């Protein structure tokens, strides 16, 4: 399971992988013998399978779809329903300095764009309602974030919302139990370690500085044992480890 965020040749942020690099990475993974699989198949698949995920549903992800279609690689885009309502910019504390500098890069998919993903054979999952730090929420707010986001996505897209991706990759036993009772089939985290719980499916975080060789290493058995993408992300954004500020949704300028 690979975890991406944005696809951009111009946004020089760790989250944004250039399109040509993304295609090189996909070809490198297939060359290593990984078999493309759906999100559901990864829950029980044995051997080398690959599924691509995109957290936050950035609009730039649309650039990657033709590459995935050509190579036959399934993907899931994880969206926050409050963003799909349109007119808002993705604004979290870690990215706040860039909101004014690169608002277009932080634009997210609206409902019609998410429906287009479904029509093209891709899957849309939940990234919670407002992208909070789930482990810091009370039980009632935690349930609301998980259950209401699933219900709103199902209402807006007309298909079942089967999977969840934890914001920031953060989860614990209480969060996993809440996800299980909120109607999901499985949930995806970010640690590189292997896990038997389908509500803590590990993913490998891919960043702008990861060329095809590094992705090859990260997806190797040794690389998966050694890597910890959450620690890597927190190293890039030190405030992530200690800040618990709420997400602020800003109206995008026309």
What are these regions (language model features)?
Residues 1-54, 58-63, 70, 75, ...:
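C-terminal active-site subregion of NodB/CE4 polysaccharide deacetylases
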Residues 2-6, 123-132:
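Histidine-centered catalytic micro-motifs
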Residues 30-32, 66-73, 109-125, 180:
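Acidic (Asp/Glu)-rich catalytic clusters
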Residues 47-50, 90-95, 134:
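Surface-exposed, active-site-proximal loop segments in enzymatic domains
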Residues 81-84:
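Short beta-alpha junction loops
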Residues 86-104:
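Aromatic- and acidic-residue-enriched segments that line the glycan-binding/catalytic groove
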Residues 104, 112, 215:
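Short histidine
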């Amino acid at each position: 399971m690979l975890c991406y965020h944005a696809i951009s040749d111009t946004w020089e942020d760790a989250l944004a992988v250039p399109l040509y690099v993304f295609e090189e990475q996909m070809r490198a993974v297939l060359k290593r013998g990984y078999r493309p699989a759906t999100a559901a198949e990864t829950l029980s698949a044995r051997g080398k399978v690959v599924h691509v995920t995109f957290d936050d549903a950035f609009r730039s992800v649309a650039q990657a779809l033709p590459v995935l279609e050509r190579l036959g690689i399934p993907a899931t885009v994880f969206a926050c329903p409050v963003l799909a309502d349109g007119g808002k910019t993705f604004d979290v504390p870690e990215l706040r300095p860039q909101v004014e500098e690169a608002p277009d890069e932080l634009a997210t998919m609206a409902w019609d764009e998410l429906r287009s993903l479904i029509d093209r054979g891709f899957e849309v999952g939940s990234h919670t309602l407002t992208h909070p730090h789930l482990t810091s929420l009370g039980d009632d707010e935690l349930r609301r974030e998980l259950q209401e986001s699933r219900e709103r996505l199902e209402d807006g897209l007309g298909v079942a919302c089967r999977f969840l991706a934890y914001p920031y990759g953060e989860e614990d036993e209480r969060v996993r139990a809440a996800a299980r009772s909120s109607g999901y089939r499985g949930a995806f985290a970010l640690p590189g370690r292997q896990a038997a719980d389908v509500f803590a499916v590990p993913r490998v975080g891919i960043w702008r500085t990861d060329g095809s060789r590094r992705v090859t290493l990260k997806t190797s058995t040794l690389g998966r044992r050694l890597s910890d993408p959450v620690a890597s992300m927190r190293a890039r954004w030190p405030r992530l480890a200690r800040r618990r500020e709420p997400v602020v949704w800003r109206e995008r300028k026309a």
